[in-house]
């Protein structure tokens, strides 16, 4: 397919707390059919599962439900900010974009999400105007996470990779504990600081939270994607669909969508799997995600992409992945056993196919051999067991902008 030259304008920047990097013009796929749709065999997935029956709580800047692709997709939600304008108000755009990547329907030419059958529970916990949080605002995060649990969310998607809670992380940790005990699957951005300090930050660095890194269409860790033991999985973070001139603007491809976008797509992947297997627990959904993740080498895990790149198609289309014991977490076993009351029974030995055993802190754990492809729908950078680069025609102007 011939790529069309496009001139992109600078899009609205986000504050430092968001795991979204500056946007640039870069032609990979199209906004209507991004590259990962083909890689993940999305059309085939949708013949089996679309995310129906799954609620994804998006803790962010709110979700503008007036977008055509989000009409009928967004639940009432709640606004915990001092602004108090409502959960369906998003003056920044970050939360809305995360929601579209998860559950957008594509209506009227809008963004198509990976799990269009899922529902979004918007929980507005910041407006995008602040780069750090005080001990008082940590209580707001706690309230937001607890609201997600009490509202019956199956998945929490938190696209903030650098949460600096000044003075007290206790409330945030307590809220995570509550979510894990309730059987909620919690994803959070690893962050976009690899080119700087590359320090782990909550929430991804907290026990129980599945840290998500970002990858390029070439299957490589995105240059900005924070790495470390907190990274459990990776998902597409570059060249993702975006409204590039504000939420009412035309679609484009956000070249550096960040680990924010990767977290949204990992959450959507989990929603697809869970909708096909509604009787599974969070442990089983996460286990098959880890076991079927795509790797280009024979390592069991590394600090850059964790156990690999999410491949929901391998589970849904090919039937790969053993869900295992519903009560035994594939990672964070010791942490969950220490919870009072415990989230799961005491850890017990798992089969060798289990991806991780006895993870004490973060996602770094002893893992089994990486999942091998069945030969169907391999990602474009994996051919004949080797790593190859996509042939990409890149045209247009590159534009950078950072909000101070």
Describe the role of every protein-language-model region:
Residues 46-56, 63-76, 86-135, 220, ...:
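Subtilisin-like serine protease catalytic core
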Residues 128-202, 251-256, 261:
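Substrate-binding/access-modulating region of protease and related hydrolase catalytic domains
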Residues 380-404:
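C-terminal membrane-anchoring or membrane-association module
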Residues 157, 277-381:
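C-terminal subdomain of the subtilisin-like protease fold in secreted/lumenal serine endopeptidases
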Residues 52-55, 117-119, 150-156, 181-186, ...:
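Loop/turn elements at helix/coil->beta-strand transitions in domains of secreted/extracellular proteins
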Residues 189-208, 213-230, 242-257, 298-305:
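Active-site-adjacent substrate-recognition loops and nearby beta-strands
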Residues 2-54, 68-69:
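Protease zymogen maturation seam
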Residues 99-102, 125, 238-310:
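Hydrolase catalytic cores
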